[in-house]
Swiss-Prot record:
The lineage of its organism: Bacteria, Pseudomonadati, Pseudomonadota, Gammaproteobacteria, Cardiobacteriales. It comes from Dichelobacter nodosus. Keywords: Fimbrium, Membrane, Methylation, Transmembrane, Transmembrane helix. This is Fimbrial protein. It is a single-pass membrane protein. GO terms for cellular component: membrane; type IV pilus. PANTHER family: GENERAL SECRETION PATHWAY PROTEIN G, PREPILIN PEPTIDASE-DEPENDENT PROTEIN D. The chain crosses the membrane at residues 8-28. It is found in: Fimbrium; Membrane. The keyword Hydrolase does not apply. Residues 1-7 form a propeptide. The gene is fimA. The modification N-methylphenylalanine is found at residue 8. The keyword Transmembrane helix applies.
Amino acid sequence: MKSLQKGFTLIELMIVVAIIGILAAFAIPAYNDYIARSQAAEGLTLADGLKIRIADHLENGSCTEDANAGAGEKGNQDTGKYALAEIGGTYAQDATNLKPEDKNGCTVTITYGKGTAGAKISKLIDTKVLELEQLVNGSYTQGGATTLDAKFIPNAVKATK
């Protein structure tokens, strides 16, 4: 009587392992980019939260809070899990005939890796900076001091060439 052998041969198993290895070689870098992009998006969220503070400061003719501000003031920065956003710049208050797409002189500098202590940040964006320049209409555009790789900059603020 003949006995039937069941199962996979060594060659078949090696082919499956090779296919999984090839798929992983493409998937892991793409996943790392996805994580870095999602962490970089937090910076724009922090900057959006600072818009109200900037508007309050502009009432006093300055982008940043006065050093002698009262105890109830929030300050010129906001910290998230992965980033620190800080208001800066000089308000262009004497400019006349400004259009909504003109810059008002205020900036928000987002430094990645300076967020909440213990938060693990992607090495692709750690210590990178995204500078945002505020427009007269309150929205942001990418500033010149940005060191963050272009693929991680949120599309809403990406500079057009």
